[in-house]
């Protein structure tokens, strides 16, 4: 009976996540910024062997069923790194069938005490569901309000377009979550690196004024980041 219960629980999580993906994909408000499909095309599987242009990759001339299926999310994840986080992406570059469809998916694992640094995805929504463990999810609004909560298996979250957010493992075992972003190849802007690892560097005077800190502190912070 316990085995049947586990299967039922997993299927429930998968169904919830599929509903989430459908919502992101079909809601014009959420997916329109990333939707680049020609209205006269059913799809445009990217030809990654071709040279991309400003409009992206051209469509493959020959398409098979295999172009619309992907197993890469199941690859084992290793969180033995300084950030304690690892992810398998299903995006335009790993799954060319997503080209122009305005969606990508990620299998994410976070070690106990690990955090995905504060970051944003300009112009697009992110949402996800926890598969295992306890995850602290938070995002900041443009009026400096923090919304956050610790969530567990089967719980979902959503990050409004472009807002700074983070995820962290606050449990005692590795956590795992599936996330979906409303872009086939979303950009990511990490807050610490954006401020401390630019080339050329932001003048110390600017950061001293922003953080109310001295030059020694700013230089110490810079030393911990590379572009």
From Swiss-Prot:
Q: Quick one: which residues bind Mn(2+)?
A: 119, 121, 126, 165
Where it sits in the cell: the answer is:
Secreted, Extracellular space, Apoplast
Keyword Disulfide bond, does the record have it?
Answer: yes
- SUPFAM superfamilies, per database record: RmlC-like cupins (SSF51182)
GO CC, any one term:
apoplast
Which SMART domains does this UniProt record tie to the protein? Cupin_1
Identify the glycosylated residues: 78, 143
| Alphabetized Gene3D superfamilies for the sequence | Jelly Rolls
Q: How does it assemble?
A: Oligomer (believed to be a pentamer but probably hexamer).
Under what name is this protein listed? Germin-like protein subfamily T member 3
**Organism of provenance:** Arabidopsis thaliana (Mouse-ear cress)
């Amino acid at each position: 009976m316990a085995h049947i219960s586990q299967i039922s629980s997993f299927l429930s999580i998968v169904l919830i996540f599929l509903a989430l993906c459908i919502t992101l994909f079909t809601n014009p408000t959420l997916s329109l910024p990333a939707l680049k499909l020609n209205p006269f095309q059913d799809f445009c599987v990217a030809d990654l062997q071709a040279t991309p242009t400003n409009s992206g990759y051209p469509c493959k001339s020959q398409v098979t069923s295999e172009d619309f299926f992907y197993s890469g999310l199941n690859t084992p994840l290793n969180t033995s790194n300084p950030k304690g986080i690892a992810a398998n992406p299903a995006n335009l570059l790993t799954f060319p069938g997503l080209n122009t469809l305005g969606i990508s998916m990620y299998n994410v694992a976070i070690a106990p005490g690990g955090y995905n640094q504060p970051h944003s995805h300009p112009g697009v929504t992110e949402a996800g569901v926890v598969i295992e463990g306890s995850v602290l999810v938070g995002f900041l609004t443009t009026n400096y309000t923090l919304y956050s909560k610790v969530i567990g298996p089967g719980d979902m979250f959503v990050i409004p377009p472009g807002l700074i957010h983070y995820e962290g493992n606050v449990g005692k075992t590795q956590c795992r979550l599936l996330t979906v972003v409303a872009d086939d190849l979303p950009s990511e802007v990490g807050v610490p690196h954006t401020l401390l690892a630019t080339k050329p560097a932001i003048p110390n005077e600017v950061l001293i004024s922003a953080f109310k800190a001295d030059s020694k502190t700013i230089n110490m912070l810079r030393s911990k980041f590379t572009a």
